[in-house]
Amino acid sequence: MWRSLGLALALCLLPYGGAESQGQSSACYKAPEWYIGDQNPMLNSEGKVTVVALLQASUYLCLLQASRLEDLRIKLESQGYFNISYIVVNHQGSPSQLKHSHLKKQVSEHIAVYRQEEDGIDVWTLLNGNKDDFLIYDRCGRLVYHLGLPYSFLTFPYVEEAIKIAYCEERCGNCNLTSLEDEDFCKTVTSATANKTAEPSEAHSHHKHHNKHGQEHLGSSKPSENQQPGPSETTLPPSGLHHHHRHRGQHRQGHLESUDTTASEGLHLSLAQRKLURRGCINQLLCKLSKESEAAPSSCCCHCRHLIFEKSGSAIAUQCAENLPSLCSUQGLFAEEKVTESCQCRSPPAAUQNQPMNPMEANPNUSUDNQTRKUKUHSN
């Protein structure tokens, strides 16, 4: 229960309710009209909470996201959240169009998967979205949340919580399309949440009284005024949630935003995240520049801006949340780490200079001195 309240608070702290747009906030505004062929998916979803996922069929992580979206749909329906429309919009690029069927196979017929026309208006651009973004609209089609990586990653609970908030809370004001059944359901949910909030408070009060009573009988001294209380059981959001959208595009070279040591102390980071936090470079990969690139044809470090690592057996999938100036095909230290993404390619000296790292994790073209915490690199 406290975890749920913590998530709701974290979502509230997102600027403009988690929504973002070019130039001004799009929170609580209706989505711009967009079509797939002659279909208007948003119009078809009127009267329902609508979840729009921007997924790329050529991306392994996106296929996992689609599969998890199906799992989330089933979970929410089992809890009584029925009146929700789920929409997946595939990327407009040719590689994604060729693998559209792979994306569609990840979900049931209850989730609509749309293929964009390559020569049509790009829906992602129209919605000001990026890969793996989730846009959540209320029943009147008003944008309640626009979540990007890493908070749109479905192993985290933020998308689920955002859907529930859009379903039962009038964040954008009253909507006359809410059914009586949904109103009754939300009243029940609100009442149950209020009861759960009261129960721990009473138990905590009784526990404090019991401890004080026991201390009096045992002759224990009172705790010092300077004594700090133990850590809260409230689940905290990952570092940077409340300012995630504000800092998009203001990436600090070589460091994952959520790895800020001062902000992330005490948070329950995954093993992969902790490993990333210890590295100077986010991810050292061998990169080959695309033939179209005007840059020198040398190896480079692939510094993705919003890295997400997904363990699947021994495989590690790395992906970038947004396009960066230069394209490169990245080959990891192991065969299964091969990634083709939009990455920022830099020449080896610029990429590796002043970066503390383990030589085993570094680019083979770089030699690193852990004492001086510097690396020297040479071109192929």
Swiss-Prot record:
Purpose of the protein: Might be responsible for some of the extracellular antioxidant defense properties of selenium or might be involved in the transport of selenium. May supply selenium to tissues such as brain and testis.
Gene Ontology CC entries for this record: extracellular region; extracellular space
Gene: Selenop
Sequence segments annotated as region (Disordered): 196-257, 346-380
Domain description: The C-terminus is not required for endocytic uptake in the proximal tubule epithelium.
UniProt-recorded name of the protein: Selenoprotein P
PANTHER family according to UniProt: SELENOPROTEIN P
Residue stretches of biased makeup (Polar residues): 221-237
Broad class of where this protein is predominantly found: secreted
Biased composition (Low complexity): 348-360
Pfam families noted in UniProt: SelP_C, SelP_N
Signal peptide: 1-19
Tissue expression notes: In the kidney, expressed in the cortex with no expression observed in the medulla (at protein level). Expressed by the liver and secreted in plasma.
Organism: Mus musculus (Mouse)
Protein keywords: Glycoprotein, Phosphoprotein, Secreted, Selenium, Selenocysteine, Signal
Post-translational note: Phosphorylation sites are present in the extracellular medium.
A GO molecular function held by the record: selenium binding
Lineage of origin: Eukaryota, Metazoa, Chordata, Craniata, Vertebrata
Glycosylation sites: 83, 176, 195, 365, 370
Entry-linked InterPro entries: Selenoprotein-P_N, SelP_C, SeP
Record flagged with keyword Signal: yes
Family: Belongs to the selenoprotein P family.
Localization of this protein: Secreted
GO biological process: brain development; locomotory behavior; post-embryonic development; regulation of growth; response to selenium ion; selenium compound metabolic process; sexual reproduction
Bias type Basic residues, positions: 241-253
Phosphoserine carried by residues: 264
